């Protein structure tokens, strides 16, 4: 199962866990997802974050909705930084889920409650 391959942890001590930060003004939601906030992640052709995805699962929804995906196709300093900003509109509460993919260490996840 895919769920058995996705790793998680505390982003303050694990450089692969995506950090989710959001601001909500009315029904407009701005979400920033980054990898390596406390402990920088390498960005070389040999070891890098390939992509980040953000999902929103409304409290009354059956399935999460893919808000967006950002692929990082350039690797080496100073070309890319594993950080993405997403905007969407909702009046609903729910969960924000982020996935990131490290080419060596696989899939990583995090989640926060959207109020």
From Swiss-Prot:
The keyword Electron transport applies. Its cofactor is Fe cation. Gene3D superfamilies: SOR catalytic domain. Uses electrons from reduced NADP, by way of rubredoxin and an oxidoreductase, to catalyze the reduction of superoxide to hydrogen peroxide. Homotetramer. Belongs to the desulfoferrodoxin family. InterPro entries: Desulfoferrodoxin_Fe-bd_dom, Desulfoferrodoxin_Fe-bd_dom_sf, Desulfoferrodoxin_SOR. It catalyses: reduced [rubredoxin] + superoxide + 2 H(+) = oxidized [rubredoxin] + H2O2. One of its GO terms (molecular function) is superoxide reductase activity. This is Superoxide reductase. PANTHER family: SUPEROXIDE REDUCTASE-RELATED. Keywords: Electron transport, Iron, Metal-binding, Oxidoreductase, Transport. NCBIfam families: neela_ferrous.
